[in-house]
Design a protein with these regions (language model features):
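Short, well-structured N-terminal submotif of metal-dependent ribonuclease cores
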Residues: 1-35, 48-60, 103, 116, ...
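General small-molecule cofactor/ligand-binding pocket signal
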Residues: 34, 70, 122
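A generic structural signal for short hydrophobic patches within well-formed alpha-helices
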Residues: 9, 40, 77, 114-115
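Residue-level signal for well-ordered alpha-helical positions
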Residues: 15-16, 46, 83, 120
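Active-site flanking residues adjacent to catalytic metal/cofactor-binding acidic residues
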Residues: 4, 41, 110
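Generic structural signal for small/hydrophobic residues in well-ordered secondary structure
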Residues: 6-7, 43, 73, 100
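Active-site neighborhoods of divalent-metal-dependent phosphate/nucleic-acid chemistry enzymes
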Residues: 55, 67-112, 119
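Short hydrophobic/aromatic patches at helix-to-coil boundaries
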Residues: 64-65, 122-127
Length: 127
């Protein structure tokens, strides 16, 4: 199972060529590619603030790409307890990281702060 963080989801929806070759192959082979509703919320906020711009409405793009949505569960939120190194991270990132970890998924991201955590289940989308 692959989970796209907000940066990776935005890249997929706006310009998938930003992904590295390995990531493109990984996404092409994987049958289970998901996103968190937390990312949808974050993209919506950033679009309203003018920090991100999509070519079409977010809901339409999500349907077009046929990605799975992972519901946010209490278990996902509780997983943040077991990731104390994230306490000072962005709360959106913490929830997305915890969601991927609690489900045993690989998280796809280009976010250097997440990659620098050194977890083996976080994959650099630029590779």
């Amino acid at each position: 199972m692959l989970v796209l963080d907000t940066n990776a989801l935005f890249s997929l929806l706006s310009n998938p060529n930003q992904f590295g070759k390995k990531t493109q192959r990984l996404l092409g082979r994987a049958g289970d590619v998901y996103f968190s509703p937390v990312s949808v919320f974050e993209i919506a906020i950033k679009e309203m603030l003018g920090k991100m711009k999509l070519s079409h409405p977010l809901g339409d793009l999500l349907k077009e790409h046929e990605l799975g949505s992972l519901p946010l569960r209490v278990e996902d939120a509780l997983e943040t307890y077991y990731l104390p190194s994230l306490v000072r991270h962005d709360p959106f990132d913490r929830l997305i990281l915890a969601t991927a970890k609690s489900r045993g998924a690989v998280l796809i991201t280009s976010d250097r702060r997440m990659l620098d955590l050194g977890f083996d289940w976080i994959f650099d989308s630029t590779v």
